[in-house]
A protein has these predicted regions:
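Asp-based, Mg2+/Mn2+-dependent phosphohydrolase catalytic module
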Residues: 1-9, 101, 106-119, 123-125, ...
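Short "lid" loop at the C-terminus of a central beta-strand within the Rossmann-like core
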Residues: 52, 202-203
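Generic beta-sheet signal
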Residues: 11-13, 195, 253
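Glycine- and other small-residue-rich loops at beta-strand/loop junctions that grip anionic moieties
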Residues: 172-176, 198, 231
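Residue-level detector of anion-binding/catalytic polar loops
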Residues: 42, 194, 272
Length: 318
């Protein structure tokens, strides 16, 4: 297949955050799954219903008992749980590793080759046995004084400690925040003042997620708790406000989105919309009105024109 290119020029770029710039979907879904269990709803239903929408709108829907004066605190607490779930894996694996005897010959579960990290329980048990063998073989190269410990008891005891650490770590799910493909190059190619972030996340979550992957929130970052917003996505308000704060007409901007509600918000704002298939398959977002659909930002380049405007070039295989 030969590559095909399409280009257009705009004044500025407006980015959604989660699913577009960063991937924290696993932590978000875990947090909403907990809410679902708390209120006795099906987690899959709640997760699907909340995706791409503001936490405040979702909490109003699923926790109608919350009073208006309680809502800001409820949103802040909920979004902190997202960040806690995102940080949980790295914190606990670090703790497990530090609890195991440290020596040049000691391997921890995290330090084993990635190819050995299988997800099934059967494979996990196989890995543990193989790991025990490796560890025993490594210990065999060292002389353990009889006056200090009995060799076999020591090896068995250490092996059990490592097996326990393996079991604990293996049960964890890595929900850490990740930057998505092509994002760093895209952001670096756009001058300050020519792009903004408009997210359904409140400030705690939005700034926390971006900082975890090394993205400096732009001067114009519209979050769900912005009091100037009358409505969140799928209403166009977040993108319209972001464009206005940059000083541009939203119709002369490009919106980057990943979720159906966000794509519809971008279309309603009048902007050119690029949808990325980073959280939904192409068939799930193809009928939302996006002008272009790409796998991720690696398919798109941005060049600054002499007058400061942005030329986006989309490359696809045809």
């Amino acid at each position: 297949m030969s590559p095909s290119t399409q280009s257009f020029i705009v004044d500025a770029a407006l980015f959604d955050m989660d699913g577009t710039l960063v991937d924290s979907i696993a932590a978000v879904e875990k947090a909403w799954g907990n809410v679902a269990e708390e209120i006795g709803q099906d987690p899959e239903y709640v997760i699907a219903a909340t995706h791409g929408k503001r936490a405040i709108d979702n909490l109003r829907q699923f926790k109608p008992h919350l009073k208006p004066e309680e809502m800001d605190n409820a949103v802040s607490q909920f979004e902190q749980t997202i960040l806690d779930f995102a940080d949980e894996y790295n914190k606990k694996t670090s703790s497990y590793q530090s609890s195991v005897i440290s020596s040049p010959a000691t391997m921890t579960p995290s330090s084993s080759a990635p190819s050995s990290r299988r997800s099934s329980r059967a494979n996990s048990l196989f890995e543990q046995d193989a790991y025990d063998v490796k560890f025993r073989n490594q210990l065999s190269g060292f002389a353990i004084p009889e006056s200090a410990i009995e060799e076999e008891a020591a090896v068995d005891g250490i092996t059990e400690d490592i097996r326990a650490a393996w079991n604990a770590e293996h049960e964890l799910i890595d929900r850490s925040v990740r930057i998505l493909p092509g994002v760093r190059d895209m952001i670096d190619s756009i001058p300050e003042g020519r792009y903004a972030v408009a997210t359904s996340g409140a400030k705690t979550y939005a700034y926390g997620a971006m900082s975890r992957v090394g993205i400096i929130p732009p001067q114009v970052t519209i979050t769900a708790c912005d009091k100037r917003l009358k409505a969140g996505k799928p209403a166009p308000d977040p993108f319209i406000l972001a464009a206005e704060c940059l000083g541009y007409d939203p119709k002369r901007c490009v919106v980057w989105e990943d979720s159906p509600s966000g794509i519809r918000a971008g279309v309603a704002s009048g902007a050119t919309v690029i949808a990325v298939c980073t959280s939904h398959t192409r068939d799930k977002i193809s009928n939302c009105g996006a002008h272009y659909i790409v796998e991720n930002m690696e398919s798109v380049g941005c060049d600054v024109q002499p007058d400061g405007r942005l030329k986006f070039t989309i490359t696809s295989d045809v």
